From Swiss-Prot:
It comes from Pyrobaculum islandicum (strain DSM 4184 / JCM 9189 / GEO3). It is found in: Cytoplasm. Catalyzes the reversible phosphorylation of UMP to UDP. This is Uridylate kinase. One of its GO terms (molecular function) is ATP binding. Belongs to the UMP kinase family. It comes from the Archaea. It catalyses: UMP + ATP = UDP + ADP.
Amino acid sequence: MTLVIKLSGRVFEDEELIFKYARVIKAYSGKVGVVTGGGEIARRYISIAKRGGASYTFQDLLGIYASRLNALLFISLLEDACPIVPTNIEEFLDAWRRCRITVTGGFQPGQSTATVAALVAEAVKAPVLLNAANIDAVYSEDPKINPNAKRLPVLTYDEFERILKSSVLPGGYELMDTWSISILKRNCITTYIFDGRKPEHIEAVMRGENPGSKITC
């Protein structure tokens, strides 16, 4: 089965975790697309640029280049990966035709890497998108604020969108946004959201398990 995996930029803040993800992906025999977030590098550079008065577009560009740097690092750990980081969907598809593993970061200002991951999943006709996130599942409310928040193992995109719009989900924008949801809904691609600190959850999904939250159309 074709896999598309969205790696939170926070994964790249833990050296051992990066290597663990590389091992899991190398062990998988099928085709894999990976989209990396910008992480701490992006946040730091954007903060400095914002303080200096840079436009939102310029701040987005810094985040994009940070995510591409993470992508290039990840490529260096994967023998079967395309050695070039695609910068748009056309370049991604070109690499996809030639390589077993293709890794990319952001594409353009105003577009999250969550949307990039959705576009990639759509373009390669992947049945599922695996989101290694900075939370372990989707909750009805922020569990840090409300300890009684309900963990939601299965939900629809419509239900998930309502939770996002209520602004109670931690890391919501990084997790998914309106554009990414619309792309995934129109293709009926199933998304699995799980704790990004546990790369073994990729293997769990492949075994038919649900280690976090499963979002369907």
